[in-house]
From Swiss-Prot:
Belongs to the SNF7 family. Residues 12-52, 195-220 form a coiled coil. This is Charged multivesicular body protein 2a. It comes from Gallus gallus. It is a peripheral membrane protein.
Amino acid sequence: MDLLFGRRKTPEELLRQNQRALTRAMRELDRERQKLEAQEKKIIIDIKKMAKQGQMDAVKIMAKDLVRTRRYVKKFITMRANVQAVSLKIQTLKSNNSMALAMKGVTKAMATMNRQLKLPQIQKIMMEFEKQAGIMDMKEELMNDAIDDAMGDEDDEEESDAVVSQVLDELGLNLTDELATLPPPGGSLAAGEGRAAEAAAALADADADLEERLKNLRRD
């Protein structure tokens, strides 16, 4: 039985075979339990029927059968639980075996990579990469400086002149608008002198009124 097509079965194949056998056993136990449960229901119906007819001897015999049937049902439930526990253990073994095989493969791959990984060569490659990258940066900087020297001055002068012209134009418009909103100089001075004269006259009237009241008080 350990040979499959002239060769020995692997542990994985043996585990799968035993797993299938346990699954079939659990199905058989479930079917037998269901038959016993159906028989239990039938016995209960017969007991009630005989009890109504007054046949107590038959009732006692069927009651014993009912007790035995219920015990068998419990035994089948226990047996199925045990078989299921064994099936779970086999499944755990399969999982552990799969994990071990995977770890074995990973270990081999890591060993191969470590053998192929030569640190001096990698270090040399990185140093050469940094060197070439530095040379490329220097060349790019020199090219940018040359382009700026050749094209940047004229463009900068033209752009700066345009900005200055725009700013001066905006300032000129703003100053013109503000000057237009100011009142004429003569009108402002005349209005100020008129308000000062009115204030002086009001003060003089108040002083005269106060002086008149003091005179009246002295007469009284």
